[in-house]
């Protein structure tokens, strides 16, 4: 590769890095770094199946969606307190700000956490506090999207919708995540109708 080509590529990268950006689809649980996962595991007395963060980082080479989801849900187990959700959200928003993201819209799926005994208040209050601090300190605009899991039941999705009602005015939209097969969004028509009836916008849904 010629010197001029290398310089051109570097100039383009520098230009791209400096541009203001919007990140409109990111799942907070999937942003959990190996170092933070281990820190939260220690804080909450949770054993992980890896010896250290370096061994965990080696697993971040995914063969398919399911291999990603397996690690994704393993990470969910270390998020227990409002402080945990605050730290996760604040770390992500700091990284986004460093990358010149000026607007970030973040999904979080309460069902995994509620199923393991985490109060919905801990999740929502931790995430929203971090969003407010990031806006005040860094000037980044952040929106929260609540996601339900397609591998769970529609009834559970409707319960989740009810559980986040106290924060409805701070939720930018409702979406859906998880393994697409064999879980088509058509199983959740009543859920989507209910979300629309309550005034929520519907965000991007994996098809």
Where are these regions (language model features)?
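Conserved small/polar residues in nucleotide/adenosyl-binding loops
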Residues: 206-207
């Amino acid at each position: 590769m010629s010197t001029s080509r290398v310089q051109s590529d570097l100039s383009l990268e520098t230009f791209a890095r400096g541009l203001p950006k919007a990140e409109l689809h990111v799942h907070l649980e999937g942003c959990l770094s190996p170092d933070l996962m281990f820190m939260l595991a220690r804080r909450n007395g949770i054993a992980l199946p890896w010896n250290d963060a370096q061994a965990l980082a080696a697993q971040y080479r995914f063969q398919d969606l399911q291999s990603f989801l397996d690690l994704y849900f393993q990470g969910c187990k270390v998020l227990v307190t409002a402080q945990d959700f605050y730290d996760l959200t604040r770390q992500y928003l700091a990284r986004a700000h460093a990358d010149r993201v000026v607007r970030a819209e973040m999904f979080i799926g309460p069902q995994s956490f509620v199923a393991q005994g985490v109060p919905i208040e801990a999740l929502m209050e931790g995430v929203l506090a971090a969003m407010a601090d990031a806006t005040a300190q860094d000037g980044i605009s952040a929106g929260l999207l609540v996601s339900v899991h397609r591998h769970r039941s529609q009834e559970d999705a409707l319960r989740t919708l009810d559980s986040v009602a106290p924060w409805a005015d701070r939720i930018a939209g409702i979406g859906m995540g998880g393994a697409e097969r064999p879980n088509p969004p058509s199983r959740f028509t009543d859920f989507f109708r209910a979300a629309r009836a309550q005034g929520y916008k519907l965000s991007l849904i994996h098809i």
